[in-house]
Amino acid sequence: MAANIIKELEREEAQRLLAARAIPEFEPGDTLRVNVRIKEGERERVQAYEGVCIARSGGGVHESFTVRKISFGEGVERLFPLLSPSIESIEVKRRGVVRRAKLYYLRDRRGKSARIAERSNVRKVEVADAE
């Protein structure tokens, strides 16, 4: 009985947080720009982190996603909680075609072998949503 109450409260909290902000639909393989609020002493600024979403995990309040980018020749991964208040916005830059839910194999690849093909049917989906 207690587990059901906790699940119910978490579901309600997730719905409340999702209603308060616009989080776009994205999947592993998509290129994202995540604008993150960073506090440095008294100042607060927004930093853009752009890379490929390589994984989504969890659900509800605990859902998170991992973004990987190459910075100065080194691979950098960052794990973001989806409903974190430090995330100001998420933009989908490119839609990728992948056949896996977890793209951890990209860690071992460099250069052209690490590229992800762009989804070509994105325009049709946007037109269908507009109608």
Curated annotation (Swiss-Prot):
* Source organism, top-level taxon: Bacteria
Single annotated GO MF? structural constituent of ribosome
Q: Which InterPro entries match?
A: Ribosomal_bL19, Ribosomal_bL19_CS, Ribosomal_bL19_sf, Translation_prot_SH3-like_sf
User: Which positions form S-S bridges?
Assistant: none
Is the keyword Ribonucleoprotein in the record? yes
Q: Carries keyword Cytoplasm? A: no
**One Pfam family cited in the UniProt record for this chain:** Ribosomal_L19
SUPFAM superfamilies associated with the record: Translation proteins SH3-like domain
Q: Which GO terms describe its cellular component?
A: cytosolic large ribosomal subunit
Q: Could you list this entry's UniProt keywords, alphabetically sorted.
A: Ribonucleoprotein, Ribosomal protein
Q: Which GO terms describe its biological process?
A: translation
Role, per record: This protein is located at the 30S-50S ribosomal subunit interface and may play a role in the structure and function of the aminoacyl-tRNA binding site.
Which family does the entry's similarity section mention? Belongs to the bacterial ribosomal protein bL19 family.
Name this protein carries in UniProt? Large ribosomal subunit protein bL19
- Taxonomic classification, please? Bacteria, Pseudomonadati, Pseudomonadota, Alphaproteobacteria, Caulobacterales
What gene name is given for the protein in this entry? Answer: rplS
